[in-house]
């Protein structure tokens, strides 16, 4: 694999955890736990090949429509997993950032997020961006509200200025968006940042998306010609 032509920023919609669990007669919680294992493997592989930014779609603003028990279990997993991986962040130089409406989350989840961000803020091998309580439209709406409350004049507004009001404005646009699980849609993920992303839709359910499959998708990206409108 030619590392020079790899994407700088990869985003992944981790779809298929519940269907995987259902197919094996397991609870959705077990599906999410298995999905966490794949996520860690993908992080390790990204570090190995030199990808600098990796974004996971963890929980969307629309996911609140799910069963209360499932949401509670998922939030428990998120809060506990973030804190349990501090050694992993430090050993591998992983900087944690979070996109989404964090302030609307429960105190426990919010505290875990803030602790992870604070602990890893000086690491620089890989930026791991977790989209939690995230929706692309919601992010744009919050950015508009922040702009209106700022000192900027409307006539000065351009793409660069508007981007500065998005969550984590230091993040580059996505070069590659991968969605597992077989569905061909983007589900409100990073609407502003995927303008020129290459898209790959995999039929593989997320708990079965191993680094070998990820490697093939990265190679597929390398063979694509990106014109950026030219």
Swiss-Prot record:
Task performed by this protein: Catalyzes the condensation of isopentenyl diphosphate (IPP) with allylic pyrophosphates generating different type of terpenoids.
Signal peptide range: none
EC number: 2.5.1.-
Cofactor(s) named in the record: Mg(2+)
Residues reported to bind Mg(2+): 15, 198
PANTHER family the record matches: DEHYDRODOLICHYL DIPHOSPHATE SYNTHASE 2 (PTHR10291:SF0), DEHYDRODOLICHYL DIPHOSPHATE SYNTHASE FAMILY MEMBER (PTHR10291)
UniProt-listed Pfam families: Prenyltransf (PF01255)
InterPro entries in alphabetical order: UPP_synth-like (IPR001441), UPP_synth-like_CS (IPR018520), UPP_synth-like_sf (IPR036424)
GO process annotations (BP): polyprenol biosynthetic process
Source organism (scientific name): Borreliella burgdorferi (strain ATCC 35210 / DSM 4680 / CIP 102532 / B31) (Borrelia burgdorferi)
Keywords: Magnesium, Metal-binding, Transferase
Family: Belongs to the UPP synthase family.
Enzyme class: transferase
Subunit: Homodimer.
Active-site residue list: 15, 63 (proton acceptor)
Gene3D superfamilies for the chain: Decaprenyl diphosphate synthase-like
Residues that, per the record, bind substrate: 16-20, 60-62, 64, 66, 179, 185-187
Note describing how the cofactor binds: Binds 2 magnesium ions per subunit.
The protein's name: Isoprenyl transferase
NCBIfam families: PRK14837.1, uppS
Gene Ontology terms for molecular function: ditrans,polycis-polyprenyl diphosphate synthase [(2E,6E)-farnesyl diphosphate specific] activity; magnesium ion binding
């Amino acid at each position: 694999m030619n590392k020079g032509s790899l994407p700088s920023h990869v985003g992944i919609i981790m779809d298929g955890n519940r269907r995987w669990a259902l197919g094996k007669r397991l609870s959705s919680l077990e599906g999410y736990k298995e999905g966490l294992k794949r996520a860690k493997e993908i992080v390790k592989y990204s570090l190995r090949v030199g990808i600098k930014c990796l974004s996971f779609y963890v929980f969307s603003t629309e996911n609140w429509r799910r069963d209360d028990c499932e949401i509670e279990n998922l939030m428990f997993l998120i809060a506990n997993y973030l804190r349990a991986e501090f050694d992993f962040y430090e050993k591998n130089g992983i900087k944690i950032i979070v996109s989404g409406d964090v302030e609307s989350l429960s105190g426990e989840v919010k505290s875990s997020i803030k602790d992870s961000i604070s602990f890893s803020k000086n690491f620089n091998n890989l930026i791991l961006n977790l989209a939690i309580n995230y929706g692309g439209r919601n992010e744009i709406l919050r950015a508009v509200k922040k702009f209106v409350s700022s000192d900027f004049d409307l006539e000065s507004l351009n793409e660069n200025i508007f981007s500065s009001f998005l969550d984590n404005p230091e993040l580059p646009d996505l070069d590659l968006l991968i969605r597992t699980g077989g569905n061909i849609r983007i589900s409100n993920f990073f609407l502003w940042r995927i303008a020129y992303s290459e898209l790959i839709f995999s039929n593989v359910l997320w708990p079965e998306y191993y680094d070998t499959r990820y490697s093939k998708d990265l190679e597929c990206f390398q063979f694509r010609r990106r014109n950026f409108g030219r």
